[in-house]
Swiss-Prot record:
Annotated metabolic or biological route of this protein: Carbohydrate metabolism; galactose metabolism
Protein name as catalogued: Putative UDP-glucose 4-epimerase
Active site: 140
Enzyme class: isomerase
Binding positions (substrate): 115, 140, 169, 183-184, 198-200, 207, 263-266
EC number(s) reported in the record: 5.1.3.2
Entry keywords, A to Z: Carbohydrate metabolism, Galactose metabolism, Isomerase, NAD
Positions with a binding annotation for NAD(+): 10-11, 30-35, 50-51, 71-75, 140, 144
Annotated family: Belongs to the NAD(P)-dependent epimerase/dehydratase family.
Pfam families in alphabetical order: Epimerase (PF01370)
Organism: Methanocaldococcus jannaschii (strain ATCC 43067 / DSM 2661 / JAL-1 / JCM 10045 / NBRC 100440)
Length: 305
């Protein structure tokens, strides 16, 4: 049995689907703060609870759990700056609570979602590999890194094995264009409504956009990775201006973007070195144009606009 925290969320629900496709039994733990009931796979068991609940073991039978895939988190960078206590409560104390349940019930493996976009900070060199210095620019980046360190500590103290996946910018179906969504779903949402999206700064800032299906596949493979920290991205950088052009072309949008002042605390250029993931047998399969086409179709068909 695999426990997926945040399994009703954007990335977590794709992981659940991939596990069930591969005949795993799955329990979803999600408090539906940002998760969505519509994302829940009917073949999974669903528990509506919070990773911070001290009585989690009264709600979930941890004796049946062999692996935890820990996706539940506070993921809003700007929220973390405005409310670092809330961010730390979920991302640090919530993670410790999950680790304590694992220790108590002898669960020997965790796969953890970390952030390649947030833990490294402003890159010293590109592409950014796993040995790049850690220098977060936000409480979110720091809380993700502290989560990593607690997991490594529990490995040293109690022998709990881990795979830590540092995601780049994940996009795909089920990403909510409201709130702290990725730029791709926000741009698509705007252009499908025939509205001009806002680009903060000059639009030359770059990101590494990885498709959610590829990320789900990485989590499945990570069940067999032992005590590894691995970047999960594409190894390619795409500017926000290039992204706008790709989406504009896919949708047939006739307007232009609106440029606004840059946001504080955001990295200017980043993309990840994925050689380690490739050496472990994982590589991204869906390129950006194909991925965007899928998201546009999904948003049209699901009335998310």
């Amino acid at each position: 049995m695999i426990l997926v925290t945040g399994g009703a969320g954007f990335i977590g629900s794709h992981i659940v689907d991939k596990l069930i496709e591969n005949n795993y039994d799955v329990i979803i733990l999600d408090n539906l703060t940002t998760g969505n009931k519509n994302n829940i796979n009917p073949k999974a068991e669903f528990v509506n609870a919070d990773i911070r609940d001290k009585d989690l073991d009264e709600k979930i039978n941890f004796k049946d759990v062999e692996v935890v895939i820990h996706q539940a988190a506070q993921i809003n960078v700007r929220n973390s700056v405005e409310n670092p206590v809330y961010d730390g409560d979920i991302n640090v104390l919530g993670t410790i609570n999950i680790l304590e349940m694992m220790r108590k019930y002898d669960i020997d493996k965790i796969v953890f979602a970390s952030s390649g976009g947030a833990v490294y900070g402003e890159p010293n060199y590109l592409p950014v590999d796993e040995n790049h210095p850690i220098n977060p620019l936000s409480p979110y980046g720091l809380s993700k890194y502290v989560g990593e360190e607690y997991i490594k500590l529990y490995n040293r103290l109690y022998g709990i094995e881990y795979a830590i996946l540092r995601y780049s910018n994940v996009y795909g179906e089920r990403q909510d264009p409201k709130g702290e969504a990725g730029v791709i779903s926000i741009f698509i949402d705007k252009m499908l409504k025939n509205q001009s999206p806002i680009i903060f700064g000059d639009g030359n800032q770059t990101r590494d956009f990885v498709y959610v299906g590829d990320v789900a596949k990485a989590n499945l493979m990570a069940l067999n990775w032992k005590n590894e920290i691995v970047n999960i991205g594409t190894g390619k950088e795409t500017s926000v201006n290039e992204l706008f052009d790709i989406i504009k072309h896919e949708i047939g949008f006739r307007g232009e973007a609106i440029y606004d002042k840059p946001r504080e605390g955001e990295v200017y250029r980043i993309y990840l070195d994925i050689k380690k993931a490739e050496s472990l047998g994982w590589k991204p399969e869906i390129d950006l144009k194909e991925g965007i086409k899928r998201v546009v179709n999904w948003m049209k068909n699901n009335n998310r606009t």
